[in-house]
Amino acid sequence: MSETATQNKETRGFQSEVKQLLHLMIHSLYSNKEIFLRELISNASDAADKLRFQALSNGDLYQGDADLGVKLSFNAEANTLTISDNGIGMSRDNVIEHLGTIAKSGTADFFSKLSEDQSKDSQLIGQFGVGFYSAFIVADAVTVRTRAAGLANDQAVQWHSAGEGDYTIEDITKESRGTDIILHMREDGKEFLNEWRLREVIGKYSDHIGIPVSIFTAVKDDEGKDTEEKHWEQINKAQALWTRNKSDIEKEEYQEFYKHVSHDFADPLTWSHNKVEGKNDYTSLLYIPAKAPWDMMNRDHKSGLKLYVQRVFIMDDAEQFMPSYMRFVRGLIDSNDLPLNVSREILQDNKVTQSLRGACTKRVLTMLERMAKNDNDKYLEFWKEFGLVLKEGPAEDMANKEKIAGLLRFSSTEVDSSEQTIGLASYVERMKEGQDKIYYLTADSYAAAKNSPHLEQFKAKGIEVVLMYDRIDEYVMNYLTDFDGKQFQSITKAGLDLSKFEGEEEKEKQKETEEEFKSVVERTQSYLGGRVKEVRTTFKLATTPAVVVTDDFEMGTQMAKLLEAAGQAAPEVKYIFEINPEHALVKQMADEADEQAFGRWVELLLGQAMLAEKGSMEDPSQFLGAINELLTKR
């Protein structure tokens, strides 16, 4: 290896987020410092994958050196550890882009989530993916020498930083293609200047890497003793894990491979490894993470699988093999049926891609169903992290709507908790005799749902109601119309009918009361005019004087709020005003002869109903005026 400095040396400042990340890593990840080696070897493996891919269309990039690998050497006297690869390498612009900045959207949001709690911070940093910067966990300075494939020897670059505010970059001459990372070790990082410690870490983290990882070590004599001669000895198996038989792979190997492909620190919740032969020949290895990425709900969040074709790496983040509502899935797919020169554009409309997407989707749904059935506690862990994303499924994937619906979890009146633990199948099992609908309520929050006046008749009749209070719920219910042969019924809709649960005597009494109150309803309708769609009596309330509901085919309150929050114009919702003739306030309103006072009562009851339904009203001053006037008269 021969490198010489030449010219064009400059000092540049780090992007501010890089400085913050370096500081946090040194303090938050210290207890797990050996991961720096996993990250750097993983990056070297990626560099080899990228060279293989580019060499498919330009074999000259190999420059006579097609045996790709990673090499580790150390110098205890100089206090340095060097990780070298002969992969794709980097140009000067690449180095500035990748080593001086964090090229990720939403980084400011990520850093805003960090705290002073080191254990929590380390988990967040792990989700962010530290990559190259992990070198500073054990090194007080790092030197990178790199030459991109296809560039001349004198177009190499040297980058150097002590991990503080800036770095230097200069042109050098480098004979070998690829990248050398030289770590100038801290005092507390010297444990890695030891061959057996390096062997231990490589065996733990990098056995599954598909290229050789070698150490520069002494040649053994016939008696197994070290000689003065040295050579490169391969340490890892260098066989891509997914190509091996499942029966030969240990649980720990699957877990470490997940960390390699995802750059996550935590073990996955579960995984599925499958080799399929038939119409399409492919291997898939799919993981369900334990923790959601910090930017999961960001529109620019990168998702998708690693794509290989005939064991050759093609691309990262191939989102064409997973629907958007499964963007939390990590792993890879290795196809024998796609062309090696496949592009993202070709993938988009490719029949093989569509077939593999369908198969992978079903595989993930099966994984989740198995988890929900066999380990409910683990499934609820998954739900807390990814439930909001999975809820997008019924709107996006009609073919698997029933399966997805079975995986959804909600709260309900059956449990006194905001935890979403109730599945639709368990709700159906508990349905009251004669009940043929799944009753649900959407609201802004659990508290608003739990205390909704719409629940009063259901509580009285002992009928369970599913409580939905995530913003996406109302949108999802536009697509989720039934489950297990049972129709969904919103309890805030005018078409709600529970008469089958009432006796004939009760029905007769309600009919008489409705007739008696006909004039009050007409008087109220006359006062309100076009402000409401209709006024009518209701017998579904116990302690509440009035509510508002919408027609079955009219947009609901929560959907209108969702559109408004997204900056879209929502059509005006025309409510039906329902009054409870058995409530003392309604009776007092009915007995009021003075039209102005009657109007104040109507404003009071309508205002209450609108507040309970929407959490707001168009004219609060009119409502407050009605309250003040009525209180003054008492």
Curated annotation (Swiss-Prot):
Keywords: ATP-binding, Chaperone, Cytoplasm, Nucleotide-binding, Stress response. It is found in: Cytoplasm. GO terms for molecular function: ATP binding; ATP hydrolysis activity; ATP-dependent protein folding chaperone; unfolded protein binding. InterPro entries: HATPase_C_sf, Heat_shock_protein_90_CS, HSP90_C, Hsp90_fam, Hsp90_N, Ribosomal_Su5_D2-typ_SF. GO terms for cellular component: cytoplasm. Residues 1-344 are annotated as: A. Coiled coil: none annotated. Residues 345-561 are annotated as: B. It holds the Pfam family HSP90. Residues 562-634 are annotated as: C. The keyword ATP-binding applies. The keyword Cell division does not apply. Molecular chaperone. Has ATPase activity. Homodimer. Belongs to the heat shock protein 90 family. This is Chaperone protein HtpG. The gene is htpG.
